[in-house]
Amino acid sequence: MKEKIYEYKDDHNWFISQWSKVGSSTYYEEEAEETYSSIEQSLRGLLDEGNSFILTVIKINSNIALVRFILKMLNEEQQDNFKVSSHKGAILVTQGQQLLLVCLPKKGITITDFFEKEKKVSELGDTILIATRNEGKTKEFSQMFAQLGIKVENLNQYPDLPEVEETGLTFEENARLKAETISHLTGQMVLADDSGLKVDVLGGLPGIWSARFSGLDATDQSNNAKLLHELAMVFDIKDRSAQFHTTLVVAAPDKESLVVEADWSGYIDFAPKGNNGFGYDPLFLVGETGKTAAELSNHEKNIISHRGQAVKKLMEVFPAWQNAH
C-alpha cells in the first residue's frame, strides 16, 4: 500500500482517500451514500487490474467535486489522463478522444436536450452559465444576451454545484472567484458578476456587502430600510449621490479570464418608488431623470444600467478575447 494520503476539503465537501490493493468506502452520512456511491462505483471501473483505493467521504454536496477528486488520484497513480466536464447537466469523463463514462443527474436528461447541437463560442451562440441563483439578475442577463442569440442558464439548473464563498475584498476578486471556480468545476464558459451600490457619503458602502448590508438574513426590504436609516440626516439630494457598479468576469478552461466594469450614476431617493427591478432599484434615482430604477421598464433599464453598460463592453471585447486565447 502506498503511503500518500489524498484529501480535498472546502466549505461543502471533504474527501480523504488512499491508494490500496483492496477497495472500500465510508460515508459519514447515510443519505450521502445513497446519493453518491453509484458514481463512486462507476469511477472504480476505470481502475487498472489490481488497483483500488480506500475512500472516506466526511461531507459532500457536489457530484462533480467527488469525480474530480477521484480522477485526480487515478491520473497520478496510474499515469492516466482522465478529464471531466459537464454537458447539459451530465458529468462526462473522457481520455483523449474517448468518452468513458457519463453520469446523469438524478432526474435524467431528455434525449433531445442531451444531443442538441451546440453552436460555436466564436459565433456568440453558446450557452453561458451565469454564476447566480438570483432569478431577477438572470432575467436581466437573459434579455441582454437574447439579442445575440446566447442562451443563459443559472446555478438553479446545476443543483449539485457547491456554493462559492465571496471572500474577496473587491468586486473583481469576488467575480473572479465565482467565475473561475465554477468554470473549473464544470468545464464550461461561466459569467460571474459582482455588483453593488456605492454611496459616496457613506464612503462607498454598502459596496461589496450590498446583498447583506442589513445582516446575514438580509432581504431587499431590510437592506433598503437600513440604507434609508443611514442617510436619514442627509437632506440634500445632491449629497446622496451614488453609483451602481458591476464587474463582469468571463472564465473558461485554459483561458485567461476576461474582466469588464461599468458604473451607473444617480442618487438615493428619500422613499422607495416603482415596482420593477430588485435590490436597491426602488431607491436609486437615475441621473437627473427623477425616476428610480424600479420605475423604468426592463428595456429602458437594460440600455442604461450598470449591467447593460458592462454587457455592452463585454460584447465589444469578447470576440478578440476568444480568438486570442
Curated annotation (Swiss-Prot):
UniProt-annotated stretches for the region NTP pyrophosphatase: 129-324
One GO biological process this protein is involved in is: nucleotide metabolic process
* Cofactor stoichiometry and binding remark: Binds 1 Mg(2+) ion per subunit.
Q: What is its EC number?
A: 3.6.1.66
Catalytic function, reaction form: XTP + H2O = XMP + diphosphate + H(+); dITP + H2O = dIMP + diphosphate + H(+); ITP + H2O = IMP + diphosphate + H(+)
Q: Which InterPro entries match?
A: dITP/XTP_pyrophosphatase (IPR020922), ITPase-like_fam (IPR029001), RdgB/HAM1 (IPR002637)
Q: Which UniProt keywords apply?
A: Hydrolase, Magnesium, Metal-binding, Nucleotide metabolism, Nucleotide-binding
What are the catalytic residues? Answer: 194 (proton acceptor)
Task: Report the NCBIfam families cross-referenced here.
Answer: PRK02491.1, PRK14822.1, RdgB/HAM1 family non-canonical purine NTP pyrophosphatase
Q: Which Gene3D superfamilies match?
A: 3.90.950.10
Protein name per its UniProtKB record: dITP/XTP pyrophosphatase
Residues involved in Mg(2+) binding: 165, 194
Cofactor field: Mg(2+)
GO cellular component terms, semicolon-separated: cytosol
Superkingdom, taxonomy of origin = Bacteria
Quaternary assembly: Homodimer.
